[in-house]
Design a protein with these regions (language model features):
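Catalytic Walker B motif of ABC-type/P-loop ATPase nucleotide-binding domains
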Residues: 110-113
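Conserved ABC ATPase signature
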Residues: 60, 85-89, 93
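Conserved ABC ATPase "signature" region
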Residues: 48, 63-81
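Conserved ABC transporter NBD signature motif
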Residues: 7-15, 24
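Conserved catalytic motifs of ABC-family nucleotide-binding domains
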Residues: 106
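H-loop (His-switch) and adjacent beta-strand-loop-beta switch element
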Residues: 159-172
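H-loop/switch region of ABC-family ATPase nucleotide-binding domains
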Residues: 146-147
Length: 195
């Protein structure tokens, strides 16, 4: 966990550092584009690791936990992968299983760094649609870091732009993707932008 350079990160009005590991994991899930390889772990078992905040370190799954894993794999379209070795699936399939693991945590906040990495266009749209559904139908706060502006524009309810020396406030997609903002974000001249 990185310490903030300034200020504090609050979750439900409390400093993030006030939460113990399991309590934090029940509130906040993180999906990174790369993960450690595991030996002889099925996709079901890998996704089930998201239940550890509820099962404890021994990871003994109850029937409720197993159902949560099945539901998460189904939601991301990875049910057929459940019995396959996590190391023997494609990068795109791995992204789906990583998302299922995060969903298994049943967090209130889901942070994703470049979740569409390694996915083809169809896979990107499917994954982003799942994230949008989680936000709109389940009330999950979904925060996504993307460099693909076209994808962000399709799904975002709010956009925060990271400039070389500053960060914008929350913008509507219309504001964020206005030509003048894109030019400023990428330090483009009008001619470069319109080329």
């Amino acid at each position: 966990q990185l310490a903030p350079l300034g200020g504090a990160v609050l979750l439900d009005g409390r400093s993030l550092t006030d939460y113990t590991g399991p309590a934090r994991a029940r509130k906040l899930a993180l999906m990174l584009p790369h993960t450690r390889r595991t030996e002889l772990t099925s996709c079901f078992e890998f996704a089930a690791a998201g239940r550890i905040p509820y099962t404890g370190r021994l990871g003994i799954l109850s029937d409720t936990d197993r159902q949560a894993v099945r539901d998460a794999l189904e939601l991301v379209g990875a049910s057929p992968l459940a019995g396959r070795d996590f190391n023997c699936i494609s990068d795109g399939q791995r992204q789906r299983v990583l998302l299922a693991r995060a969903i298994c945590q049943q967090p209130g906040v889901l942070l994703l760094d470049e979740p569409t990495s390694f996915l083809d266009v169809k896979g990107k749209i499917e994954l982003l649609t799942i994230l949008q559904k989680l936000a709109h139908e389940q009330g999950l706060a979904v925060i996504v870091s993307l460099h693909e502006l076209d994808m962000a524009q399709k799904i975002a309810d709010a956009v925060v732009c990271v400039f070389p020396h500053s960060v914008s406030g929350a913008l509507t997609p219309k504001e964020a993707f206005a030509p003048e903002n894109i030019r400023a974000l990428y330090s483009l001249t009008k001619e470069q932008y319109e080329a």
